[in-house]
C-alpha cells in the first residue's frame, strides 16, 4: 500500500481492459525520471548520480529513501530511466514483423505495394485479425518487383487508347529489393535489370548487388508510412506505429526489477540485467565517440553490430544462430525473455501461481476418531496462523479475552496476534505495553489465532481433480502433524508413509461461506467425474464391517454398551437384544441399525455373491437388504460401503444429504473400530500356508504347464505350429507359451484360494475388499508366475541367453522368466533376478508416465479452463462462443446422476404387453389390482379407453426409439437423474403400502399426473418453437424412463401406490429433477479436463500386446490419448474397422472375399523367390525344370514374337502357392497385370495354376532389330532387369486398396433391436485393417459405409466432415478411457470433443490449437510461447478484455466464475423480518470516555442544551436511503469504523446539502412540534425551553407535562451536572446506539434510559410509526415495557430496571413484534448496505482516523454550543445555502464529497474519538471553540 494515499477500506476499482502497445521514443523519454549516462553503478560506495543505481530510479536499500517519490524500499515501485542510443537499433523481438512490413511497402516512398483494387488486397481487408491481415497483404505484395505508378508518365500515349485511366497509385516507380534477415542484420538484394539493347556479354560482373540495411535506413522507411496505411496493414498508429518497433531510446528498468545483493559490508553483486545494461551503455558511448571522431564506416558498422548484439541478448539470450552473451564465469546471462518464459518464469511462476500467506504444511497421520470433515491441527500451527475477525457487539467480550491472552496464550487457550484499527493502523500485540492500547472498539479487526471449528482448505499435490482441495473444520491437537480421517485419503490420493499436505486459512467471510457451502468434505463425497462417491469405508473399518455383519457375530452386553458410547445420537435407550436367553446378545447387524439413517432403502449383493443363489435371504448371506434404515440381511463389504456407484454412502448422500453421509462415515468408523478393537484381528505367515494336498495339486499344475511348454517348443523347432492370423510363427509360439504359463499361475492360485478356510485372515481381507486381491493370494501361496518386460517374456540379453548359465536358445519357462516358486517358498537367484527386471520396468514406467500425463492434464485444463455454464443454460467460453447449448445435452449436473435400468428395453413383446397394457377387450378380464367401480369405468367409458390406448402406443414408440436410436447396443442401464425406482420404494415404505391391498387410485389420474409432470420438468423454459424443440430433446430420455416406470398399470399392479404416496412420488421427482440441473457459473470446462486427466494418470503408459486381445495391435493408454488430443497427423497404428453388408458378413467365406479385395497385394507378398538367369535361347531354356512348359508354351505362341527381339536375360519368379490361394489370385491375373503395366516392353510366360511350382518367366523386348551389338546390350540388360525386378516386387499392385497393408477377419457379436423379442444378438464377420484409406474402402460394394470407421481422426474429417469426427473423437476417447475399466461421465468427454470441434475444424489441444484462438493475449501467454504472444500483442496493439479466468488471476481480481459471475442485490422485503438488536451493557470498562469531566466542553449549559431535539429527534437522517446502518442489527457497534456506517458515507444522498432532510424547512421536522421549526426559539441555544432545567421539553408533547412528577426539574436525574446527562451521549438521537460504541447508553447507569429523553414518551410525536426513533438498535424503546411508564419511579438512572436483565430487554417486548411500527415498510432501518463497508470517511484527504460518528464523541470539540452551526442565523446554516458555501472555512480544502470530516485537518493524526488517552486539542479544536466551525462538520449540516 502506498503511503502517499491515506488508508481506505474501500475496494480497489477493477481493471476492465488491458491495452497492449509499444512505447514510442517520446513516451519513454517522458515517463523516465533520468537519462542514464554512466555504466557504473556506485562511486566511492555511494550510488552514482546518472548511473544505473541512481537513487532517483528507486531504492533497493532499506536505509535509503527513493529520491523521486520519497517512499522507502517496500513502497517505491521504481521509476524508469532512459538511454539515448547513438544509432537506432533493431528490437530483436520485432525483427520478423519489421521484415513483413518492409516487404509490404515501397522501399522508397513507403506506400503499400499492392493495389487497393486488387482482389487479393480486398480479401485481406476483410480480415479482422491484424496478424492474419498482414500475412494476407504480404501475400498480395510479395510478387511486386517495383512500386507501380511511377512509369505512368512514359506510357501516356498508350493510355489514350485504353479504357479510362485508372486512378494512379501515386507510386514512385522504384524497384523493390528482395529483403532477408541474417542474424541481426537485414539484407536487401537488388536484381540489376538489363536494358533490352544490352549485349549479354557486356556485363561480366554479377547481376545482383547485396547491401546490409542498418536500422536507421529501415526506420526512415517505416516513419514515412502514413497512419491510414498503418491501419490497412493491421497496426494501430495510436498504440503501436511500425517505426516504434525500432529502438531509438532504450528504457532502463529501475533497480527494484534488477536488485543487487550485498556480498559483504562493501561490495555488492549486481544482477545480470544490470551487467548487460552496463555493457549496452558502454558500447553506446563507444559508438557515439567513434561517430564524433569521424571514424571510417566499417569500424562504425562493427561497433553498431556489437551494440546491436548486446541489445539483442539483453532482450533474449537464446536466439537461434547467435552466440550467448555470458558473464565472466562463462554462465549465459538471464535475459528479459527467460525471466518471463517457462514454469518458473514471471507468468507461470509469480502471477499464475504464487506462494501465499496463511498456509501451513506438515506430515499427515491418520486419526479414525475425528469426523471426515475435521482436521487435526497442531497447536504450533494454530497459534501462528490468524483469521481477521471484526469486532461486533456479539463477539467483543470474546475478542477482548483473546487480545488479553495475546500472541502467547496460556496452554490450552488461543489468543490473538494483531489489532487492526478502523483506520487501517495495525497494532502488534507482542509489543504492546499499555493495556490501554489493547482497547477494542466496534469495527476494529482482531487477527486471532485459529480456533476449533474454523474452516480451512486442505490440499495435497498433485491436485489432479476437484477433490484434491477440500474444506475441513479444524480441531487443535497436540504434537506436530495434521490428523486426517482415513476415509478422506482416497480423494486426496494420500497415504501415511510420509506424505505432507497443505492447509490454507480463508481470510474473509465470503471465502469462508464458499468453503462451507461448496468445498466442505461432505459436499464433495460424490464426484462429478464418474457420478459416484469418492469416499467410502477403507482399511480396518471395512474389514471390521465384514466381520461384524457376518451371521454368526454376536456381541456381549458390556461390549455393546461400550460401543453405544461411541454413537453421538445415543439417547439412553439401548435397543432390544436379538437373543435374550441364556444371556442377552446383540447381532453385529444391529450396530448398523443404529447408524444407517431411517429413510434409507437399499438392495445390493456382496462381492462374492454367486448368481445361482436366489431368494430373499441367500444361503451365503450375500444379499444386502436395508429397509427403513434397518440392515435386515447380508454381509457388508466393499461393494456396499466402498466408492462404487449406488453404494450405501451414495444412497445416503443423495437421499438424506451430505451431512448424513458424513455422520454415517464417522459413526461406522467409531463403532466398528471399537468392536474390532475388542474382537481383534491379526494376520501372520500361517495364513499364507496351504495344506499338503493343495500343494501337491499346485505342483502338478505347474509341472503340467512345463510339459505343455516343452511340447510347444518341440513343435516350434519342427516348424509344425500354425501361425495365428496376423502373427509370425515365433509370435504365435510366444503367445501360446504365455497363455499356458499364465493359466498355470491362475489355476494354481485358484486351488490355493479354494483351500483357504473361511476363518483365514488373508481371505477375510480379500473378501471384505480392504486389502489384497486374488492374485496376491496366489502369488504368496502358489506361484509367482511369468515375469514380463515390455509385454513379452524376459528377452535374450546376449548370445542367445537370458543369463550366462542357461544354454543357448533355451526357450523353456525357467530361462525366460517363469517363477514357479511362491513368495512363501522363496525365489531362486535367477528367479529373483527376473522378478527384479519385471519390477524395475514398472517403476520406470510410472516415472515416465507421471510427466506425460501431467503435461496432458495441463493442456486439457488450459484448453477448457474458461468454459462455464451461463445463466441461460448454455455452455460458453470466455469469448462467449457457444460450446454446447445445454451442458451434456440435458443440462444436468453429473453429481446427481445415477445409473438406472430402462425396463422396457429388454422385454419381449409379450412381457411388454403384460406389464403395460390393460386387456380391456378380454371378456373374462377381472384384474385383482383394480377396484370394481374403476373396472366398470374402464370397460364402459369409451374416452377412457382412448386415454389408455394413447398411453400404450406412446410406451411402444418409446421402446422402439430406445432400441433403434438411443440404446442401440442393447445396454439397458444408463446414467440418468432422479432415481425413480428408489423414490417409489421409499414411498411404499414411508406410506406403509400393503402390497396385498388394492390401490385407491383411478388409472386416468395416474396418466394425467405423469403427463402434467412432464410439462413441469423444464430444462429450457420458453414457448417459442426453438425452445420447445430444445426442451423436448433435453428431457426425451428422462421422460421415456419416467413414462415406463410410472405407467398406470405398473403403479396399480406392481407398486400398489395409494393416492397420497403417488402424489408424494410425483412431487419428489419434480423437486429432485430441478435440483439436478447444473448450477450456472459452474466451471465445467475445468471439471471436464480434470475428469479426463485424472484417469489418464492411472492408465498404463506403454500398452503391450495383450495376450489374445486381437490380431491387430492398437495403441492404447497414454500414447493413444496423446495422439487423439494432439490430433496427430501420423498415428502409430492407423486402422479401419470395416463392417460388411448383411450378405457378406454372414459367412467367413464372404468376408474372406472382401478381405482379398481390400488387402493391398504387391507381387512381393505372393513371391517365393526370384532369380536372374542368362538364358540365351528364348524359345527353349537351360533350366531343366522349366523345359517342358516353355516348349509347350511356344508350340502355340499367342502372338508373333520375333525371337531376335527378346533379350537373352531372364527374370524367373517363383510364386508362393499358399499365398496365391489365400489371396484368390491366378497366374493369368498376375501376367495380365504385368502386361498392363509394361505393355510390350516385357514378354511374360507362365505355367499352369496346378503345376507343382508356379513360375513366371519375364524377358525384356528390345526394339532394335538383329543382335548385332549383342555384347554391349546384354551387359546393360541384366542391370536393367534387376531394377525391374525390385520395382515389380514393391511397386506392382496386384489388387486391393493402397495403404491397406493387412486385413484381419474377426467375428463380433452384434445386437439388434427386434420388435417382438427385445434385443437379439447375432454373430457377424467384420474386418480390421492395418493402414487406413477410408474413402476407397467405403466405395467397395460389399462394405457397409454407414458403420465402417477409422481411428484416424484427420482422415474422418476429410472424408465425412466435422460432425462425424466429433462422434469418432468421442468413441476413441471412450475406448481409451474404458480400456482399463475406468468410466467417465459422458458430459466431460462431450465438452472436450465440442471444444475441439466447435470451430468447424479440429483444434488440437496443443499450443498450435489452443493458442490460435481469439482469446486474450494474457490468457494465451500463460500457456506456452509466452514472449512471442506478448510481443505480437504489443506490435498489433491488442486489447485484453479480461473475461477469462487466467487474466483475472494475473491481475489479482475476482474472476467472473462461480460466485463471481453474478452481482449481489439486497432483498428489501426480507429486511422487514430482520431481528432488532438489543445491545447488552458491555461498555462499563469504557465509561472513561464518557464522563463529562473528561469532556473538554462538557460544563457549559449550552453544551447541555445541545440535547435539543432538533438535533436528536428530527427524522431527517432517516430519509437518506443509504443511511440505515443505524439500524442494521449488526452495526450496533461498528459505528466507529469508517467502514461500517454507510449512513455517513459522503456519497449518501441523505447528506447532499440540498437534501430536504437537512433544510430546516424540511417537513421532516415534524410540523406538530414547533420545537423543530427553524423559526422556533428552540433553536437558539439559549432558549429556555431547552435549558436543562426547563420543566417542559416540547410544548406539544403531552407527556412532558411539567406536572409529571418524574419530570420535575428537581428530579435528581435532571441535575445538569448529573453525569448521566452528559449531553454528548448520542443515545438521545434515535439513531443512537448504532453510532457510538462508547455511548454510555450501554452502561446500566447510562442516562440513555432516563425519561428525560423525549424519545421515550409513547405519545411523543417523534413516535409516529414512520419515525425512525423506533431505532431497532435502541435496546430500550419498547413503549409498553413497564419500566418505561413515564410515571414509573424506577426511572432514576441507577434503577436496576436498566440493568441488562431488565425486562425491557426481553425479546418478547413488543418492540420485537413484527407489527411494531418500527418494522413498517417505511422504516428505512433495514438497508442492504447495512454492515457493508461503505467508503464513508475513508476518502477524506484529511484525518483518516476520524470516524464519521465522531460528532457524537464526548471529547469531540464539534459540540461546542457556540458553533454557528446551531444558530439559524449562522450564514452557513441558511436553509437555501448549500452547505458548501464558500464562507465555510473548511470546505474549501476538500472536494465536496469529502466534507464530513473535512474539519479534521490532516494534522490530527492521532486523534481517535474514543481514546482519551491520546487526545490532545489541536488546531481543529481551537477553531471549533472560537466558533468558526463549518456547518458541514456536524451531522446537522452534514452534506
From Swiss-Prot:
Kindly indicate whether the keyword ATP-binding belongs to this entry.
Answer: no
> Where in the cell?
Nucleus
Region span, Alpha-amanitin binding: 785-795
Annotated residues for binding of Zn(2+) 2: 106, 109, 147, 172
Q: Which residues form the signal peptide?
A: none
User: What are the start and end residues of every segment in region (Disordered)?
Assistant: 152-174, 1538-1839
Keyword Nucleotide-binding attached: no
Modification after translation: The tandem 7 residues repeats in the C-terminal domain (CTD) can be highly phosphorylated. The phosphorylation activates Pol II. Phosphorylation occurs mainly at residues 'Ser-2' and 'Ser-5' of the heptapeptide repeat. The phosphorylation state is believed to result from the balanced action of site-specific CTD kinases and phosphatase, and a 'CTD code' that specifies the position of Pol II within the transcription cycle has been proposed. ATX1 seems to regulate phosphorylation statment.
Q: Where are the residues of the annotated region Bridging helix?
A: 829-841
What keywords were assigned to this record? DNA-binding, DNA-directed RNA polymerase, Magnesium, Metal-binding, Nucleotidyltransferase, Nucleus, Phosphoprotein, Repeat, Transcription, Transferase, Zinc
- Per UniProt, where does Zn(2+) 1 bind? 66, 69, 76, 79
Q: Where is this region: C-terminal domain (CTD)?
A: 1544-1813
Portion annotated as DNA-binding: 326-397
Question: Its Gene Ontology molecular function terms?
Answer: DNA binding; DNA-directed RNA polymerase activity; metal ion binding
**Ranges annotated as biased composition (Low complexity):** 1538-1726, 1747-1798
Tell me which EC number(s) this protein carries: 2.7.7.6
Q: Which reaction does it catalyse?
A: RNA(n) + a ribonucleoside 5'-triphosphate = RNA(n+1) + diphosphate
Superkingdom in the source lineage: Eukaryota
Here the segments flagged for biased composition (Polar residues) are: 1727-1745
Q: How does it assemble?
A: Component of the RNA polymerase II (Pol II) complex consisting of at least 12 subunits. Interacts with RDM1. Interacts (via CTD) with PRP40A, PRP40B, PRP40C and CYP59. Interacts with MEE12/CCG1 and MEE14/CBP1. Binds (via CTD) to ATX1, especially when phosphorylated on 'Ser-5' of the heptapeptide repeat.
Role played:
DNA-dependent RNA polymerase catalyzes the transcription of DNA into RNA using the four ribonucleoside triphosphates as substrates. Largest and catalytic component of RNA polymerase II which synthesizes mRNA precursors and many functional non-coding RNAs. Forms the polymerase active center together with the second largest subunit. Pol II is the central component of the basal RNA polymerase II transcription machinery. It is composed of mobile elements that move relative to each other.
- Miscellaneous notes for this chain? The binding of ribonucleoside triphosphate to the RNA polymerase II transcribing complex probably involves a two-step mechanism. The initial binding seems to occur at the entry (E) site and involves a magnesium ion temporarily coordinated by three conserved aspartate residues of the two largest RNA Pol II subunits. The ribonucleoside triphosphate is transferred by a rotation to the nucleotide addition (A) site for pairing with the template DNA. The catalytic A site involves three conserved aspartate residues of the RNA Pol II largest subunit which permanently coordinate a second magnesium ion.
Q: What is known of its domains?
A: The C-terminal domain (CTD) serves as a platform for assembly of factors that regulate transcription initiation, elongation, termination and mRNA processing.
Its protein name is: DNA-directed RNA polymerase II subunit RPB1
Q: Which organism is it from?
A: Arabidopsis thaliana (Mouse-ear cress)
Amino acid at each position: 500500500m502506498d503511503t502517499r494515499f491515506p488508508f481506505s477500506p474501500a475496494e480497489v476499482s477493477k481493471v476492465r481492459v488491458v491495452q497492449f502497445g509499444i512505447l514510442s521514443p517520446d513516451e519513454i523519454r517522458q515517463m523516465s525520471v533520468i537519462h542514464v549516462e554512466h555504466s557504473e553503478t556506485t562511486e566511492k560506495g555511494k550510488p552514482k548520480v546518472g548511473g544505473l543505481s541512481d537513487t532517483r530510479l528507486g531504492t533497493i536499500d532499506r536505509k535509503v529513501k527513493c529520491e523521486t517519490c520519497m517512499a522507502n524500499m517496500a513502497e517505491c515501485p521504481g521509476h524508469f530511466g532512459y538511454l539515448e542510443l547513438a544509432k537506432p537499433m533493431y528490437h530483436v523481438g520485432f525483427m520478423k514483423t519489421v521484415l513483413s512490413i518492409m516487404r509490404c511497402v515501397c522501399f522508397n516512398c513507403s506506400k503499400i505495394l499492392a493495389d487497393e483494387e486488387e482482389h487479393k488486397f480486398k480479401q485481406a481487408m476483410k480480415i479482422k485479425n491484424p496478424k492474419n491481415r498482414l500475412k494476407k497483404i504480404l501475400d498480395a505484395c510479395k510478387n511486386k518487383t517495383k512500386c507501380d505508378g511511377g512509369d505512368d508518365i512514359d506510357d501516356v500515349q498508350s493510355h489514350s487508347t485504353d479504357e479510362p485511366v485508372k486512378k494512379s497509385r501515386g507510386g514512385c516507380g522504384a524497384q523493390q529489393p528482395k529483403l532477408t534477415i541474417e542474424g541481426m542484420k537485414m539484407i536487401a538484394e537488388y536484381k540489376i535489370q538489363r536494358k533490352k539493347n544490352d549485349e549479354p556479354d557486356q556485363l561480366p560482373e554479377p547481376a545482383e548487388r547485396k547491401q546490409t540495411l542498418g536500422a536507421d535506413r529501415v526506420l526512415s522507411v517505416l516513419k514515412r508510412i502514413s497512419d491510414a496505411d498503418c491501419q490497412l496493414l493491421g497496426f494501430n498508429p495510436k498504440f503501436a506505429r511500425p517505426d516504434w518497433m525500432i529502438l531509438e531510446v532504450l528504457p532502463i528498468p529501475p533497480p527494484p526489477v534488477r536488485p543487487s545483493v550485498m556480498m559483504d559490508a562493501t561490495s555488492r553483486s549486481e544482477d545480470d540485467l544490470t551487467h548487460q545494461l552496463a555493457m549496452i551503455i558502454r558500447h553506446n558511448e563507444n559508438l557515439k565517440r567513434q561517430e564524433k571522431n569521424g571514424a571510417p564506416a566499417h569500424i562504425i558498422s562493427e561497433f553498431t553490430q556489437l551494440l546491436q548484439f548486446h541489445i539483442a541478448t539483453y532482450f533474449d539470450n537464446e536466439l537461434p544462430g547467435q552466440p550467448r552473451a555470458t558473464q565472466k564465469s562463462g554462465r549465459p546471462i538471464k535475459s528479459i525473455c527467460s525471466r518471463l518464459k517457462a514454469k518458473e518464469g514471471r507468468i507461470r511462476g509469480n502471477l499464475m501461481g504464487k506462494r501465499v500467506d496463511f498456509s501451513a504444511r506438515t506430515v499427515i497421520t491418520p486419526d479414525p476418531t475425528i469426523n471426515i470433515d475435521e482436521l487435526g491441527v497442531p497447536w504450533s500451527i494454530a497459534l501462528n496462523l490468524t483469521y481477521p475477525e471484526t469486532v461486533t457487539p456479539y463477539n467483543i467480550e470474546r475478542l477482548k479475552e483473546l487480545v488479553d491472552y495475546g500472541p502467547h496464550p496460556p496452554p490450552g487457550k488461543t489468543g490473538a496476534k494483531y489489532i487492526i484499527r478502523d483506520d487501517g493502523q495495525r497494532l502488534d500485540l507482542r509489543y504492546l505495553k499499555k493495556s490501554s492500547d489493547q482497547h477494542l472498539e466496534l469495527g476494529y479487526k482482531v487477527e486471532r489465532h485459529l480456533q476449533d471449528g474454523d474452516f480451512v482448505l486442505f490440499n495435497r499435490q498433485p491436485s489432479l481433480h476437484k477433490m484434491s482441495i477440500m474444506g475441513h473444520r479444524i480441531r487443535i491437537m497436540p504434537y506436530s502433524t495434521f490428523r486426517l480421517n482415513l476415509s478422506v485419503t482416497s480423494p486426496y490420493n494420500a497415504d501415511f508413509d510420509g506424505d505432507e499436505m497443505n492447509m490454507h486459512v480463508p481470510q474473509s467471510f465470503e471465502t469462508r461461506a464458499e468453503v462451507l457451502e461448496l468445498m466442505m468434505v461432505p459436499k464433495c463425497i460424490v464426484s462429478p467425474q464418474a457420478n459416484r462417491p469418492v469416499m467410502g469405508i477403507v482399511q480396518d473399518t471395512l474389514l471390521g464391517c465384514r466381520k461384524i455383519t457376518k451371521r454368526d457375530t454376536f456381541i456381549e452386553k458390556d461390549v455393546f454398551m461400550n460401543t453405544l458410547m461411541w454413537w453421538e445420537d445415543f439417547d439412553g435407550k439401548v435397543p432390544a437384544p436379538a437373543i435374550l436367553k441364556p444371556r442377552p446378545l446383540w447381532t453385529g447387524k444391529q450396530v448398523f441399525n443404529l447408524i444407517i439413517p431411517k429413510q434409507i432403502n437399499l438392495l445390493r449383493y456382496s462381492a462374492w455373491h454367486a448368481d445361482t443363489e436366489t431368494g430373499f435371504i441367500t444361503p451365503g448371506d450375500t444379499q444386502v437388504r436395508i429397509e427403513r434404515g434397518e440392515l435386515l440381511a447380508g454381509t457388508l463389504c466393499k461393494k456396499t460401503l466402498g466408492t462404487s456407484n449406488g453404494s450405501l454412502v451414495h444412497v445416503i448422500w443423495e437421499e438424506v444429504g451430505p451431512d448424513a453421509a458424513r455422520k454415517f462415515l464417522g459413526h461406522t468408523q467409531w463403532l466398528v473400530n471399537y468392536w474390532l478393537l475388542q474382537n481383534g484381528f491379526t494376520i501372520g505367515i500361517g495364513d499364507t500356508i496351504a495344506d499338503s494336498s493343495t500343494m501337491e495339486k499346485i505342483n502338478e499344475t505347474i509341472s503340467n504347464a512345463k510339459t505343455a511348454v516343452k511340447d510347444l517348443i518341440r513343435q516350434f523347432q519342427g516348424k509344425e505350429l500354425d501361425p495365428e492370423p496376423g502373427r509370425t510363427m515365433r509370435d504365435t509360439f510366444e503367445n501360446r507359451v504365455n497363455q499356458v504359463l499364465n493359466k498355470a499361475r491362475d489355476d494354481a492360485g485358484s486351488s490355493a484360494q479354494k483351500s483357504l478356510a473361511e476363518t483365514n485372515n488373508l481371505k477375510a481381507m480379500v473378501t471384505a475388499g480392504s486389502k489384497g486381491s486374488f492374485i496376491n493370494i496366489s502369488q504368496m501361496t502358489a506361484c509367482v508366475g511369468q515375469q514380463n518386460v515390455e509385454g513379452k517374456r524376459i528377452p535374450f540379453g546376449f548370445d542367445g541367453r537370458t543369463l550366462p548359465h542357461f544354454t543357448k536358445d533355451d526357450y523353456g519357462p525357467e530361462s525366460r522368466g517363469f517363477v514357479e516358486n511362491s513368495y512363501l517358498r522363496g525365489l531362486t537367484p535367477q528367479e529373483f533376478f527376473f522378478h527384479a527386471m519385471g519390477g524395475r520396468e514398472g517403476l520406470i514406467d510410472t516415472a515416465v508416465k507421471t510427466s506425460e500425463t501431467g503435461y496432458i492434464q495441463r493442456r486439457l485444463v488450459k484448453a477448457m479452463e474458461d468454459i462455464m455454464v451461463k445463466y441461460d443454460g448454455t455452455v460458453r467460453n470466455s469469448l462467449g462462443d457457444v460450446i454446447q447449448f445445454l451442458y451434456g445435452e440435458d443440462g444436468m449436473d453429473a453429481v446427481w446422476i445415477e445409473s438406472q435400468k430402462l425396463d422396457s428395453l429388454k422385454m419381449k413383446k409379450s412381457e411388454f404387453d403384460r406389464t403395460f397394457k390393460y386387456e380391456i377387450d378380454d371378456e373374462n378380464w377381472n384384474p385383482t389390482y383394480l377396484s370394481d367401480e374403476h373396472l366398470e369405468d374402464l370397460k364402459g367409458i369409451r374416452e377412457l379407453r382412448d386415454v389408455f390406448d394413447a398411453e400404450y402406443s406412446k410406451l411402444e414408440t418409446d421402446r422402439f426409439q430406445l432400441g433403434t436410436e438411443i440404446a442401440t447396443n442393447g445396454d439397458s442401464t444408463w446414467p440418468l437423474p432422479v432415481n425413480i425406482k428408489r423414490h417409489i420404494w421409499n414411498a411404499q415404505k414411508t406410506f406403509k403400502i400393503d402390497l396385498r391391498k388394492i390401490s385407491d387410485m383411478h388409472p386416468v389420474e395416474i396418466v394425467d399426473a405423469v403427463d402434467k409432470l412432464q410439462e413441469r420438468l423444464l430444462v429450457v423454459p420458453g414457448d417459442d418453437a426453438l425452445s420447445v424443440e430444445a426442451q423436448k430433446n433435453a428431457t426425451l430420455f428422462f421422460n421415456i424412463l419416467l413414462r415406463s416406470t410410472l405407467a398406470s398399470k405398473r403403479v396399480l399392479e406392481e407398486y400398489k401406490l395409494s393416492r397420497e404416496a403417488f402424489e408424494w412420488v410425483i412431487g419428489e421427482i419434480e423437486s429432485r429433477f430441478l435440483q439436478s440441473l447444473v448450477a450456472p457459473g459452474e466451471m465445467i470446462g475445468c471439471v471436464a479436463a480434470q475428469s479426463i486427466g485424472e484417469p489418464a494418470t492411472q492408465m498404463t503408459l506403454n500398452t503391450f500386446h495383450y495376450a489374445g486381445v486381437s490380431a491387430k495391435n492398437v495403441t492404447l493408454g497414454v500414447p493413444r490419448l496423446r495422439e487423439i488430443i494432439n490430433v496427430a497427423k501420423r498415428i502409430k497404428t492407423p486402422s479401419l474397422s470395416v463392417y460388411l453388408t448383411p450378405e457378406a458378413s454372414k459367412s467367413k467365406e464372404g468376408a474372406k472375399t472382401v478381405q482379398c479385395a481390400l488387402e493391398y497385394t504387391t507381387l512381393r507378398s505372393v513371391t517365393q523367390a526370384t532369380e536372374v538367369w542368362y538364358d540365351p535361347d528364348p524359345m527353349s531354356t537351360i533350366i531343366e525344370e522349366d523345359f517342358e512348359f516353355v516348349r509347350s508354351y511356344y508350340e502355340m505362341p499367342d502372338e508373333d514374337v520375333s525371337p531376335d527381339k527378346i533379350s537373352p536375360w531372364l527374370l524367373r519368379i517363383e510364386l508362393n502357392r499358399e499365398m496365391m490361394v489365400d489371396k484368390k489370385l491366378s497366374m493369368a491375373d498376375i501376367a495380365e497385370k504385368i502386361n498392363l503395366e509394361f505393355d510390350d516392353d516385357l514378354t511374360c510366360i507362365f505355367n499352369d495354376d496346378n503345376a507343382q511350382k508356379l513360375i513366371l518367366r519375364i524377358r525384356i523386348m528390345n526394339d532394335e532389330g538383329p543382335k548385332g551389338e549383342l555384347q554391349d546390350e546384354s551387359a546393360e540388360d541384366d542391370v536393367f532387369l534387376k531394377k525391374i525386378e525390385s520395382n515389380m516386387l514393391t511397386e506392382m499392385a496386384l489388387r486391393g486398396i493402397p495403404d491397406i497393408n493387412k486385413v484381419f477377419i474377426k467375428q463380433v457379436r452384434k445386437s439388434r433391436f427386434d420388435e417382438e423379442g427385445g434385443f437379439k444378438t447375432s454373430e457377424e464377420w467384420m474386418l480390421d485393417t492395418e493402414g487406413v484409406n477410408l474413402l476407397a474402402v467405403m466405395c467397395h460394394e460389399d462394405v457397409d459405409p454407414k458403420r465402417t470407421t477409422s481411428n484416424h481422426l484427420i482422415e474422418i474429417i476429410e472424408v465425412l466432415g466435422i460432425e462425424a469426427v466429433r462422434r469418432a473423437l468421442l468413441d476413441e476417447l471412450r475406448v481409451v478411457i474404458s480400456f482399463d475399466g475406468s468410466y467417465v461421465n459422458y458430459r466431460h468427454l462431450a465438452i472436450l470433443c465440442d471444444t475441439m470441434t466447435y470451430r468447424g475444424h479440429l483444434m488440437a489441444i496443443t499450443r498450435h490449437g489452443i493458442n490460435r484462438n481469439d482469446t486474450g493475449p494474457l490468457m494465451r501467454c500463460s500457456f506456452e510461447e509466452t514472449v512471442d504472444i506478448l510481443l505480437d500483442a504489443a506490435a498489433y496493439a491488442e486489447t485484453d478484455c479480461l473475461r477469462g479466468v487466467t487474466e483475472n488471476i494475473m491481475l489479482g481480481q475476482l474472476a467472473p466464475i462461480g460466485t463471481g459471475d453474478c452481482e449481489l442485490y439486497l432483498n428489501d422485503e426480507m429486511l422487514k423480518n430482520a431481528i432488532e438488536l438489543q445491545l447488552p451493557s458491555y461498555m462499563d470498562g469504557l465509561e472513561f470516555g464518557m464522563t463529562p469531566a473528561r469532556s473538554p466542553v462538557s460544563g457549559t449549559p449550552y453544551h447541555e442544551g445541545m440535547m435539543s431535539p432538533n438535533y436528536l429527534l428530527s427524522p431527517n437522517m432517516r430519509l437518506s436511503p443509504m443511511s440505515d446502518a443505524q439500524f442494521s442489527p449488526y452495526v450496533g457497534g461498528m459505528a466507529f469504523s469508517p467502514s461500517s456506517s454507510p449512513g455517513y458515507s459522503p456519497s449518501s444522498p441523505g447528506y447532499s446539502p440540498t437534501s430536504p432532510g437537512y433544510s430546516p424547512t424540511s417537513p421532516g421536522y415534524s410540523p406538530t412540534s414547533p420545537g423543530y421549526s427553524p423559526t422556533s426559539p428552540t433553536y437558539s441555544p439559549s432558549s429556555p425551553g431547552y435549558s436543562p432545567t426547563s420543566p417542559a421539553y416540547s410544548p406539544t408533547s403531552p407527556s412532558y407535562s411539567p406536572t409529571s412528577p418524574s419530570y420535575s426539574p428537581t428530579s435528581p436525574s435532571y441535575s445538569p451536572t448529573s453525569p448521566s446527562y452528559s449531553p454528548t451521549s448520542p443515545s438521545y438521537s434515535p439513531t443512537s446506539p448504532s453510532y457510538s460504541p462508547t455511548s454510555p447508553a450501554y452502561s446500566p447507569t447510562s442516562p440513555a434510559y432516563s425519561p428525560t429523553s423525549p424519545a421515550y414518551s409513547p405519545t411523543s410525536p417523534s413516535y409516529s410509526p414512520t419515525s425512525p426513533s423506533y431505532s431497532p438498535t435502541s435496546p430500550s424503546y419498547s413503549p409498553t415495557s413497564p419500566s418505561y411508564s413515564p410515571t414509573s419511579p424506577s426511572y432514576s438512572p441507577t434503577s436496576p430496571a436498566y440493568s441488562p436483565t431488565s425486562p425491557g430487554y426481553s425479546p418478547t417486548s413488543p418492540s420485537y413484534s413484527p407489527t411494531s411500527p418500527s418494522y413498517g415498510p417505511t422504516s428505512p432501518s433495514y438497508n442492504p448496505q447495512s454492515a457493508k463497508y461503505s467508503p464513508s470517511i475513508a476518502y477524506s484527504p484529511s484525518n483518516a482516523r476520524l470516524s464519521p460518528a465522531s460528532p457524537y464523541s464526548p471529547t469531540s470539540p464539534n459540540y461546542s454550543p457556540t458553533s454557528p452551526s446551531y444558530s439559524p442565523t449562522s450564514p452557513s446554516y441558511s436553509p437555501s445555502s448549500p452547505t458548501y458555501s464558500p464562507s465555510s472555512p473548511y470546505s474549501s480544502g476538500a472536494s465536496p464529497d469529502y466534507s464530513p470530516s473535512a474539519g479534521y485537518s490532516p494534522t490530527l493524526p492521532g486523534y481517535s474519538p474514543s481514546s482519551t488517552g491520546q487526545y490532545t486539542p489541536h488546531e481543529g479544536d481551537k477553531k471549533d471553540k472560537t466558533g468558526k466551525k463549518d456547518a458541514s462538520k456536524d451531522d446537522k449540516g452534514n452534506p
